[in-house]
Regions:
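Non-catalytic interaction-recognition regions
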Residues: 1-250
Length: 250
């Protein structure tokens, strides 16, 4: 349910200004497909309405099937129209989706561009986000090894509590940070091999280490303000081999 997902988003410190649902774009999707058909952007084929992508060097895809039902492709132009309407003049709409949908977006972007070049040309981008793998391999619903984000964070939290003496609240904060940073530190087109032990390591490229470093730096800065030091150093009296950049750091 939406309530369940909203609870998850709150736990991850995530927020969405607007959620779009597929059912919103059924009727408008068919209307736009018919408009595109009249303009010659789409064409009929074996009872369906398709986009022939050959002349553009991209795939041919179905927008309305032979039963008269819009496909995902058929509803996408209606979604784009709504997004550009809801948020006004946009510089770029970024779709963060797996690489398997590359063909889908190439086709729908092209159709939308042909419908309204001024509005859509070069205004949309498919940001490929690769799959996540655990040590057991790639997650797959077909193989039954899909895991939920909440489960993953809970497992990370358990490990943190096992290895440290922190309280429940601190463990929760570290677990969320460790999980999120493990995703963010990788390039979007790199398959993520999630390792719980690596994610909570107190050294190296991990959230706990970065948080620790930040806290230590804050502590040093706080203590330095209490020290009675001269605001300037008479460098002419200091005999050293330090260069100007090094002296500026001092």
């Amino acid at each position: 349910s939406l309530k369940y997902f909203e609870q998850n988003y709150k736990r991850f410190y995530s927020h969405f200004d607007r959620c779009y649902f597929e059912s919103e774009f059924y009727e408008r999707g068919i209307e736009i497909v018919k408009e595109a058909l009249k303009k010659g952007i789409l064409e009929k084929s074996q009872g369906a309405i398709i986009f022939n992508g050959k002349k553009y060097g991209i795939d041919t895809r179905v927008f309305v099937n032979s039963l008269g039902l819009p496909t995902y492709e058929g509803k996408e132009p209606a979604l784009a129209e709504k997004e550009f309407s809801d948020f006004g003049e946009l510089d770029k709409v970024i779709h963060v989706v797996t690489p398997e949908q590359t063909s889908f977006f190439k086709v729908t972007f092209k159709v939308e561009e042909l419908l309204d070049e001024k509005k859509y040309k070069d205004k949309q981008y498919h940001l490929i986000y690769e799959w996540v793998k655990l040590k057991a391999g790639k997650m797959s619903s077909r193989e039954g090894n899909i895991i939920e984000a909440n489960w993953l964070i809970d497992e990370v939290k358990k490990k943190i509590l096992e290895k440290s003496k922190c309280d429940e609240e601190t463990a929760e904060t570290l677990a969320v940070a460790s999980t999120k940073y493990s995703f963010l530190k990788n390039g979007t087109q790199t398959i993520i091999h999630f390792d719980i032990d690596e994610s909570i390591a107190v050294d190296g490229n991990s959230a706990p280490y970065l948080i620790y470093t930040y806290v230590r730096c804050q502590s040093v800065l706080k203590k330095s303000q209490k020290l009675e030091v001269k605001s300037q150093i008479l460098y002419s009296k200091v005999k050293s081999n330090l260069n100007n950049d090094e002296l500026n750091v001092l």
